[in-house]
Amino acid sequence: MNILPRINAIEKTDANHHAIAWWLIGVAALVFIMVVVGGLTRLTESGLSITEWKPVTGALPPMTEEHWQEEFDLYRQIPQYQLVNKGMSLDEFKTIYWWEWSHRFLGRLIGLAFFVPFVFFVVTRRVERALVPRLIFLFVLGGMQGVLGWWMVMSGLTDRTEVSQYRLAAHLGLATLIFGALIWTALDLLNGKSTRLLTGLAKAAAAILALIFLQTILGAFVAGIRAGLIYNTWPLMAGAFIPDGLFAMTPVWHNFFESHLTVQFQHRMTAYLLLLCVVWHWWAARKTAAAPSAGWLAVATFAQACIGIWTVLWVVPIPLGAAHQAGAMVVFGVAVWHVHRLAK
């Protein structure tokens, strides 16, 4: 029996898996960059500078001074200009416009970077039929993210001077999930498909991953209401570890999403809990094959906590705020890799 054709088929399949996996990792890297640019867009208060959603014609920026003036006139009609940026010059407007345009451009680039290779892999039969639905689902999620981004921007165009923190959290949350799904799918192709979390250690890692995602969402609420600009001391807040007034708003649930004090407090407390869980998990995994990834998760989480403290103490300077945003994605990505190692 000649086994050479079978060996060649296996080698071809492995080569295809590696090509598709690295393509997905490349798309994940673009998503990472887009999230960081999105954070910079928020930190520079640039997110409302483009007041229309034109998925196709909006791909090109203004090319003439007349077109720039038209965009500026649209911006001057919204509350953010009238109440916050009254008197802004055209040159100042161009600065914030370029941040938002770059963020949207990256979204379009990610769509092309996903769609074109996907069509190529399907047409050349390099992608297995069972993987096609998952890839289509990822593409649909990307489209939904674009719609969600515009829905978020809309919240700041009428009676607000900033976007809704609820919609901001949804926008960042979906971006984080897409980022994680791209990495997970790539790891499936590189290392063999992971289907179940069989051990207690694997289930603990999955729980930590969920906690990291929750902490990312809580961070979006901190950013959305600019809670990081006050209570700029550590480890105390308002002179106490557990400050008074955490539930001053009524109804009570509003405090968790709208109170500057409570929103920052819960982000801090969740950070402490997460750091403790990650250190405990690293200790539990130190003699297993997953020790390296558990160690990297501990290092990334500790570094992110330090950046977060530094960001608060320095009253959210733009470079540190962006680094903290990037750090959240790094921690989430490392956690996805770690869970995948344990799930095999």
From Swiss-Prot:
Cofactor(s) essential for the protein: heme b
Domain of life where this protein originates: Bacteria
InterPro entries per the UniProt record, alphabetical: COX15/CtaA_fam, HemeA_Synthase_type2
GO biological process, one term: heme A biosynthetic process
Chain sites annotated for binding heme: H267, H324
Record pathway: Porphyrin-containing compound metabolism; heme A biosynthesis; heme A from heme O: step 1/1
A GO molecular-function annotation: metal ion binding
Known EC number: 1.17.99.9
Residues spanning the membrane: 20-40, 104-124, 135-155, 170-190, 205-225, 233-253, 265-285, 296-316, 317-337
Membrane topology recorded in Swiss-Prot or TrEMBL: Multi-pass membrane protein
Compartments (UniProt record): Cell membrane
Record's GO cellular component terms: plasma membrane
The protein's enzyme class: oxidoreductase
Keywords carried by this UniProt record: Cell membrane, Heme biosynthesis, Iron, Membrane, Metal-binding, Oxidoreductase, Transmembrane, Transmembrane helix
Function: Catalyzes the conversion of heme O to heme A by two successive hydroxylations of the methyl group at C8. The first hydroxylation forms heme I, the second hydroxylation results in an unstable dihydroxymethyl group, which spontaneously dehydrates, resulting in the formyl group of heme A.
Assembly information from the UniProt record: Interacts with CtaB.
Family: Belongs to the COX15/CtaA family. Type 2 subfamily.
Protein name: Heme A synthase
Gene designation: ctaA
